[in-house]
Amino acid sequence: MFTGVQNYTQEVIKAAKYIGQGFTITLDHMNRLPVTIQYPYEKLIPSERFRGRIHFEFDKCIACEVCVRVCPINLPVVDWEFQKSIKKKQLKSYSIDFGVCIFCGNCVEYCPTNCLSMTEEYELSVYDRHELNYDHIALGRLPISSIKDPMVYGVNGLSYLEKNIIQDNTNKDTVTGPYNKE
């Protein structure tokens, strides 16, 4: 009987220890300062491995369709034709519908020629969902980096950024907007 009570007590202590570990994480998050940004005028700089809009380089693509096979929803549409003279596939068009894309990054990870990459662009809002279907021309445009964008104010004090990485972009000569009218 004594061993049964002892085992029960050990299990209770172990359970309390697990609950305490989770509670310390909760308390740690409660002690952090809020990270609220005024979105149109301040933009959050995404983390290093952020998975945003996909960038496509037409010249590198060999039309192997690996991206279609690894996509959980078979999303990329690859249109190609076989060139008998050079005995290779010739890519005609490539498109991705970002209204359906889940931004898992499998297509980027498994692409053998690295013609796909994830950008830091996260502003994909449109009024018509059909505008989210990007062809190879729209996918080839690189977005403006949010660090180099003059409309972006630096958001300092983020926990995942090292000190002095973000420079304050509030130069009065370059920033224009509704609040800087003279």
Swiss-Prot record:
Specify whether Plastid is a keyword of the entry: yes
- According to Swiss-Prot or TrEMBL, what is its membrane topology? Peripheral membrane protein
Q: Where is the 4Fe-4S ferredoxin-type domain?
A: 52-81, 92-121
One biological process term in Gene Ontology: photosynthesis, light reaction
> Binding positions for [4Fe-4S] cluster 2?
C71, C101, C104, C107
Locations listed in the record: Plastid, Chloroplast thylakoid membrane
Please classify the protein's predominant subcellular localization into one broad category: plastid
The Swiss-Prot or TrEMBL record lists the needed cofactor(s) as: [4Fe-4S] cluster
Q: Which Gene3D superfamilies match?
A: 3.30.70.3270
One GO molecular-function entry: iron ion binding
HAMAP family under this entry?
NDH1_NuoI
Q: Please give the subunit comment from the record.
A: NDH is composed of at least 16 different subunits, 5 of which are encoded in the nucleus.
Q: Protein name, please?
A: NAD(P)H-quinone oxidoreductase subunit I, chloroplastic
* Originating gene: ndhI
